[in-house]
Amino acid sequence: EFIARTKAAGAKGIRFYGICCSGLAAMYRYGGVIPLSNAVSAELVLATGALDLWVADVQDVFPAIMDVADCFKTTVVTTSESARLPGAIRCEYDHHHANIGETQALARRIVNMGIEAFTRRRGIPVHIPPYEIEAEVGFSLEYIAKRFGSIAPVAQALKDGRILGIVNMVGCSNTRVVYEQPTQVVTDILIKNNVLVLSNGCASFPLMKLGYCSRDAFTKAGDTLAQFLKPDLPPVWHVGECIDNARSSTIFGALAKYFGQDLKDMPFAFASPEWGNEKGINAALGFRLMGINSYHCVEAPIFGSKNVIEFLKHGTKELLGSSMNVNVSPEELANLIISDLKAKRVALGWAPTHAEAQA
C-alpha cells in the first residue's frame, strides 16, 4: 500500500535510517534500517538534506533540530509526551502509554507524512558524503556459541594470551572533547595490544565508520589477536544499542564461569571515554557492581560533593572490588587499561602476554 503510494508520488520506495540507539534498536529487531550516526551528530545528518521525515522518541530531541529541519523542509515528528520540540508535529503516546493500542494508526500517519514531505521537498539540495562501509553486527553469547561451537575457544584464547583481555567500549559522545577521538584512539591502542573490544550504542558509531567492525579489520589488530580473528572476524564486536550492555555482561559472565572465577578477578574492563550524562554513570556503575573497573577521559558530572566523587572513584575498591579511573589523555588511559589487564592475568597465574606464555 505505502510503496504503491510512494511510487505514485515519484519516489523509488521508502528507506529507513537510524540515529543513535533508536536506529540501532530498529536495525537489530527488524533489519532494513541503516545506522547513520550517534546522537551528537544528529544535526549533521539532517543537514545533508536527504531526509524527508525525522521521527524522534525520547532521544535526539535537540533544540537545533528544528532550525536545521526548517532549512531543508524536513518534517519533524515527536512521539513522546516528555520529549517535544516547538514546531514539530506531535504523534505520540500519552504519558502512561494508555493509547498503545493506537500504535498502527500512529505509524501509518507518520509514513503518510513522510510521503507528503517527499512531494513537498522537490528541488531541495542534497549532499550525501561519498562514503559508506560495511560492519559486522549482532554479536552475543548465543552467536559466539554458534560461531565457535561453545565459549571454550574464546576462553582458551583469553587464557593463553592471544586475547590479552576484553574491554566493553561504550558511552555517549561528549562535546567537551574532540568528537569521537578518545573512543577511536583508546580502541586503536587496545586492539593493537591484542585486547578484544565489545561495543554498543553511541560509542560504536566511530568504530563502525572507521572500519573497526568490518570483517577484514583484523589487520588493525595485534599479531595474536589477528591470528585468533582470521579470516573474517573484526577486532570490535558490535553487540547492539545502549541498553545492550547486558549482552557484554553475559559474555563476561560466561567466560568467568568457564574458569570458575569471580568477574572481578578476570581480565575485563569497562571503558566509556566520552561519557557525558547520568545514564553513563549508571552504566559504568552496573559493571563496577560486578567488580569490573571503569575508565574515562572525562570526569563524571558529579562534582557537587568531593566526598561523593572520591567514593565513586576510589572508595568502591574495597566495597565492590572496582574503581573509576579518569585520564584526559586517551593514550595514557589505554595504556592504563592494558597495564591493569596484565595485572589481572598475573594474579590468575596466567602469563601477561601470549609471547611470555610461549616462552
Segment roles from a protein language model:
Residues 1-359:
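Anaerobic metallocofactor- and corrinoid-dependent redox/one-carbon enzyme cores
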